[in-house]
Amino acid sequence: MIKKTGLLLLVVTLINLLMYLTEIASKSLGSNFLSKVFEIHHKHKKDHPSGTALMLGKGIAIGKNKDFYKLIGKKYLNKKSFPYGKKINFNSLRKGEVVGEHEVTFSSGKEIITLNHEAFD
């Protein structure tokens, strides 16, 4: 949610900032880095991956100037680990009462860069 303040400044939620940083990282790192998205939500959540996880995947695609729907890879549920691929793989974990955690990871095989966000309410 974006709010306009009396000082004409924009207050942006941190998940929107994560989306923006994901786009920048994807564009900056280029094709040598593979990416994946991991998310955790409460055990009652039915959909996977979450809308936010898909939004972050779109951020990766935008950064690469690629069609997101052609970049969607495998969608895992409750895996302890999951692979990188030429496409964007997603892993969704459902446990407890977790409000939401999202993590975008880029790997070149020699380096890993991770962006993450955790919500508490």
Model region roles, listed by residue range:
Residues 21, 30-121:
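C-terminal substrate-binding/catalytic lobe of Rossmann-fold NAD(P)-dependent oxidoreductases
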Residues 2-13, 27-35:
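Rossmann-fold dehydrogenase core element
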Residues 16-24:
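Donor/substrate-binding cores of folate-linked one-carbon enzymes
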